């Protein structure tokens, strides 16, 4: 088994997968796929808890990529830095969380 105590599983999702934020987003396949990823996060967190493996879902932000476009809020580097910084101090007790790229809690 490759995942030992202290390992972290990071699922990149989207705020569109949130039941609160994504309810009015008009792209059923995309929203559904992200909602599924959020459930995968919760299920894996439950299954891996006893092994000491943390699982977290991240909304990376509106990122300047081909998909996000040039007017998006943040760069790829800012998003990645925020996620990695959050993971450095992420407590195992919070496994199963849905977070924004900056470490703040995202509503489910």
Q: Positions of the model-derived regions?
A:
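Conserved helix-to-beta-strand junction in the class I
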Residues: 2
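Catalytic loop of short-chain dehydrogenase/reductase
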Residues: 5-50
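C-terminal helical subdomain
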Residues: 50, 57-58, 65, 69-108
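Conserved sequence/active-site signature of Rossmann-fold short-chain dehydrogenase/reductase
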Residues: 15-17, 63-64, 68
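Short amphipathic alpha-helical surface patches that serve as generic macromolecular interface elements
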Residues: 38-45, 55-57, 80-83
